[in-house]
Amino acid sequence: MDNVESKNNLKIIIDDSSNLSLNQIRNLLNKMSASEIAHALESSPPKQRGLLFSLLKTEEEGDVLFELGEEIQQDLLSNISNEELTEAVKELELDEIVDILQNLPEERMKKILSNMSMVDRDRIEMGLTFPDDTAGGLLNTDVISVRPDNSINEVISYLRDQKELPENTDKIFVVNHENEYLGEISIGKIITSDPSMIVREIMETEFFPLDAGLNDKEVATIFERNDLISSSVIDENGKLIGRITIDDVVDVIREDADQNLLGMAGVAEDTFAPPGRAAKSRVFWLSMNLVTAFIAASTINLFQDVIDKIVYLAVLMPIVASMGGVAATQTLTIILRGLTLDQINTKNIGWLFKRELAVSILNGIVLSILVGFITYAWFQDITIAILISCALVINLISSVFAGIVVPLILRKLKQDPAIGGSVVVTTVTDVVGFLSFLGLATIYLI
């Protein structure tokens, strides 16, 4: 279908569905891909979302459910019968079925599995044994494997006998009679090699398979660094149990980016979540921010007498705190990116710290001169201008310590620094900013 027409259908569903009949909406949905329908559902309020989903054909529901975010997926699953869900997912790939079923209560999951064939049930139960954030949770058992003593001609004949190759098949895997992984051969190499050659002679053994327990973010990093389309997955005994393909890795990268973005703000992924759920997802970090606000306020309270005597200190002190907070967030962002890409280690963190410290000092000198001039022009007080300039440099330097040390500590404590880091670093720079500015004012002005 033409991309323009597809985008127009999506826009009509999102913007004008209330003005359409059910048949008109159904016809538009029939012309859209699963990902486009999922986008339409995620862009709709809950009541309209349920209506749109009810208009889908049963065979389309599985693909759409897989494309949805976890919260919306769970909402829709609660309104689908076990029989309908079994029918909806039966044509999906293993990893896609596992992704959907693992969001169900255990009792319901067992009922769904009991409706499936023995072969499908065994494959899915194997997939469910792995955590969803590991290579095992991403794998698909639809793999093509051959023996090392097969000839290339035999391999080609075997491939021709398949009804169709699994999606994203760019290589086949070589295993022994115990199904232990030995190597791989690209499809291109099979086609261009002499048919009389033996698999052992041309198979590649340089690239190691992925362990089933490997974290999904590490899987994504390996795919990115090696430009992979697919990769084999082995169990703890070195036996081939499946493969991961690039489409699954793209989903991991997208979900990780969404979680980091939403986690930093402490909000839910469902844009149209009910008020109660949305409030519940935000209240924790709002409460944490309230605690840190009281910490900053108590710091200011230590200098209440100074502020009473020199009122315009209250006007200027937010400048110092704000500049430190922004600088700390910049450093934090760099560190988070480095940690995510696995670029930061004990050998280079010292160099990075010195670099960030030098940047903060240079920025501090430039900005302190600017702030000093503005303050003097505003209040005609050279002492205040000098004090706020000094406090600004101090706080920018502290922002380096906060932006680097805080995420490393959170990582050490097995906490996600992307979620809690920003709250902690801004608290540090607020406190240091107020202490340095008001402390210097107490020493030199009182």
Place the predicted regions along the sequence by residue.
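Alpha-helical transmembrane segments and their membrane-interface boundaries
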Residues: 257-393, 397-401, 405-419, 423-427, ...
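Hydrophobic packing positions in regular secondary-structure scaffolds
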Residues: 1-264
